[in-house]
């Protein structure tokens, strides 16, 4: 690999169940860093424990995005859309803000504006076409999983604002899907979907927003929209997430530590802080003259 001496960067090709398992169990490897599902992360931890390897895990997420009624409304709508359906990833990003909580005083207004944002900015098509903003899902298995979760939302009584089905008759394309009137125990609220599906629910107070945001087994990312910076920092302190954006979403910088709380992982990637996970601390004591 360009820029590195021979032998520093080595690539082992193969499927995770074979190549990944062998790497995790190998006694000559001291450190494992993994990005992927929570289930796979747990498996890696078990195998790594046999040789007491150090592990860094960045796993699942179900990130909240909170919009207060004193936020810059237009920007909040655009960033909220970006957080789940923007950037050309169709929700296929671990920090996707797939749970949007909007203060009840602007809830209906936000729903209308978000719906319009989806309609006006969605161009479904070939991902290699520069005009396309919404491409296919990564695989047939993921495509089917997303549609199954969307159907569960319908059957559990969530209100479908837009989307909710396949797009076209070719490829693994799914319509941008927005649910309203959801309940905390619904699958679409609790499970990571990893697709273009978002739930939008109202909240009343600051404490209510924090409680709803933390009502998840994950804690990877969160976003907060308010013009009151003191309030933003209070909420950021109360939200259980490794990364918190204030008045933005998904704009993580490579120099800033990244990782999660709870089932979203262990340790941090990126930034100088992450380098410590690849080092060992050694204490060397030198006797400068003490005699026994």
Where are these regions (language model features)?
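ALDH superfamily catalytic-core signature
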Residues: 25, 31, 37-183, 246, ...
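PLP-dependent aminotransferase-like
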Residues: 1-20
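Conserved C-terminal structural/oligomerization subdomain of aldehyde/semialdehyde dehydrogenase
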Residues: 29, 66, 119, 166, ...
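Short alpha-helical
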Residues: 17-18, 39-40, 50, 230-231, ...
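Short hydrophobic/charged patches on amphipathic alpha-helices used for structural packing
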Residues: 20-24, 210
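Conserved residues at the C-terminal ends of beta-strands
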Residues: 12-15, 35, 83, 226, ...
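Short helix-initiation/N-cap motifs at beta->coil->alpha
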Residues: 16-19, 61, 204-206
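Well-formed, non-transmembrane alpha-helical positions, independent of function
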Residues: 22-23, 152, 187, 277
């Amino acid at each position: 690999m360009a820029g590195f001496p021979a032998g520093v960067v080595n690539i082992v090709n193969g499927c995770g169940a074979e190549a990944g398992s062998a790497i995790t169990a190998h006694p000559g490897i001291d450190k494992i860093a993994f990005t992927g599902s929570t289930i796979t992360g747990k498996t890696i931890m078990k195998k790594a424990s046999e040789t007491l390897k150090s592990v860094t895990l960045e796993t699942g997420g179900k990130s909240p995005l909170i919009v207060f009624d004193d936020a810059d409304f237009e920007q909040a709508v655009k960033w909220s859309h970006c957080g789940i359906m923007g950037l050309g990833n169709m929700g296929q990003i671990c920090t996707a803000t797939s749970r949007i909580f909007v203060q009840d005083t602007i809830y209906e207004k936000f729903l209308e504006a978000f719906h319009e944002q989806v309609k006006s900015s969605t161009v479904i098509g070939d991902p290699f076409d520069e005009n396309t903003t919404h491409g296919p899902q990564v695989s047939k298995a993921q495509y089917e999983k997303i549609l199954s979760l969307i159907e569960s939302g319908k059957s559990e009584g969530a209100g479908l604002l837009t989307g909710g089905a396949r797009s076209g008759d070719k490829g693994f394309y799914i319509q941008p899907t927005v649910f309203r009137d959801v309940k905390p125990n619904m699958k679409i609220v609790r499970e990571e979907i990893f697709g273009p599906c978002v739930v939008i629910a109202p909240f009343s107070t600051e404490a209510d927003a924090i409680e709803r945001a933390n009502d998840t087994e994950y804690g990877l990312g969160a976003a907060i929209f308010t013009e009151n910076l003191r309030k933003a920092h209070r909420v950021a302190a109360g939200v259980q997430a490794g990364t918190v954006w204030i008045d933005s979403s998904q704009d993580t910088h490579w120099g800033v530590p990244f990782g999660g709380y709870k089932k979203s992982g262990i340790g941090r990637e990126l930034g100088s802080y992450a380098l410590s996970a690849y080092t060992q601390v050694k204490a060397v004591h030198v006797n400068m003259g003490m005699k026994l």
